Amino acid sequence: MKKNIVIVCLMLLSCFSYAQNERTETLVQSEAKGWEYELKAGVNIGGASPIPLPKEIRKIKGYNPKFNGSFEGTVTKWLTPKWGISASLRLEEKGMETDANVKNYGMEIIEQGNHVAGYWTGDVHTTYKSSFVTLPISLNYHLANRWKLRLGTFVSYRMDGNFSGYVTEGYLREGSPIGEKVSFTNGQIASYDFSNHLRHWHWGTLIGGSWQAFKHFNINAELTYGMNDIFKKDFKTITFDMYPIYMNIGFGYHF
């Protein structure tokens, strides 16, 4: 997926170079009627997190946002010189890597091919990565000649995803917080994989802004907040909801 987004971004740069020299009569007429078209590329920085952090997570020991590319096409209709509405189609990745120290954290490890569920106390390493097709819809406001603000909502469909990792330097209480103790110390690890429990459909809110750096070139920033858990409703191993929260930073070319 990452390779595909890089290829698309290179194609986008080629389109920019061509578009600087060629603007069709159709685009000129559309602009006169209040229509605006933009191609965007960016990077998502953030992660999936419970809000607020639950008592089970005692310490965040490490965080890596990874490279989460995005590519987007946007159509905007300006209803007045100040107000407009827009719809986009976005291909994007969202992910992160974290290291945390936890206590009585819901867990199902894989030990010698068997799944053992219970409550983990110790260190947890998590890798999360998903690819989405996203449809954002927003209300736009021209704050000044070069500044534009937007507020809206989005719906996303997850095409693929991974939520996995390992536990180490701690112990698992099987079944309950007072169950049989299984220890993993001195570098021993046990893996886990919750990828099959990831939800396909996501929705949420967005707020963002754009600055027109040049005649057709914009710098964009947008914060998205997912309103539903990244896991399916019937997944009970992790006892708290995890919400995708990401800041997208990038650039765009409007025709």
Indicate where each model-derived feature is located:
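Hydrophobic, lipid-facing positions within transmembrane beta-strands of outer-membrane proteins
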Residues: W35-Y37, F67-G73, V133-I137, W203-I207, ...
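Transmembrane beta-barrel strands of outer-membrane/channel proteins
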Residues: L39-I45, A87-E93, L151-Y157, A221-Y225, ...
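Extracellular/periplasm-exposed beta-strand and loop segments of Gram-negative cell-envelope proteins
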Residues: G47-K66, K94-S131, R158-H200, D229-Y246
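Outer-membrane beta-barrel "beta-signal"
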Residues: W211-K215, Y243-F255
